[in-house]
């Protein structure tokens, strides 16, 4: 297979370029946590059907409200899922912003539509050809780094984020396998399942093997992956 290339934008505005002899047509999602208006909320962005898919998974049949907002459409749905651990029904509000090519959603609990609008007013929304970027207004801000999640058939699920000093401190003292995308290390999840960590010059990528992943082939496949940030 000849090399393919794709660009994806994380919610913090960072762009990642992936290339190699892989099927890179699968969509990517991005996740980031924000501290806005006294609340911590998680924003998840993806393709135009992401919000609809989330609502279907929650058992909702449609939206309760729809508004024009920030150059797109804001759809609001309310559900009351039952949590068996605490034996209570939760009052959950789901807000979905739909742009021309991308969308994002967030969940708020015990909240009203005005609460959602207050949260959304804490950051600017900008839709690009390769994804959505949000910029918090002061004094609001990101509560963590944004992660880009993309499935690459044959390789696994990639979770990509900027390399931080905290990441560097987690690396073992020995050197990993050198690849064109960075140093590759292998570790185990709590259930004993293997996963891989790829430490690039400015990226940190977790590679989670999927059902079609041949573990013995992962080092070779990662060696054919090129991953970098771009302006």
Model regions and ranges:
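Intrinsically disordered, low-complexity prosegments and terminal tails associated
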Residues: 1-231
């Amino acid at each position: 297979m000849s090399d393919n290339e794709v660009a994806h934008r994380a919610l913090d505005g960072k762009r990642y370029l992936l290339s190699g002899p892989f099927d890179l047509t699968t969509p990517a999602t991005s996740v980031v946590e924000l501290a806005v208006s006294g609340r911590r909320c998680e924003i998840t962005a993806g393709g135009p059907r992401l919000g609809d898919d989330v609502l279907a998974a929650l058992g909702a049949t449609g939206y309760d409200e729809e508004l024009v907002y920030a150059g797109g459409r804001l759809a609001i749905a309310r559900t009351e899922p039952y949590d068996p651990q605490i034996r209570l029904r939760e009052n959950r509000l789901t807000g979905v912003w739909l742009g021309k090519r991308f969308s994002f959603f967030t969940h708020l609990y015990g909240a009203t539509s005005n609460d959602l609008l207050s949260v959304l007013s804490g950051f600017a929304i900008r839709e690009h050809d390769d994804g959505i970027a949000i910029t918090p207004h002061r004094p609001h801000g990101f509560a963590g780094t944004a992660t880009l999640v993309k499935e690459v058939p044959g390789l696994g699920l990639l979770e990509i984020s900027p390399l931080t000093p905290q990441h560097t401190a987690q690396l073992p003292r020995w050197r990993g396998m050198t690849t064109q995308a960075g140093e590759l290390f292998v570790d185990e999840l709590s259930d004993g399942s293997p996963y891989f960590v790829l430490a690039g010059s400015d990226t940190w990528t977790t590679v989670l093997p999927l059902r079609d992943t041949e573990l013995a082939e992962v080092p070779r496949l990662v060696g054919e992956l090129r991953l970098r940030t771009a302006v």
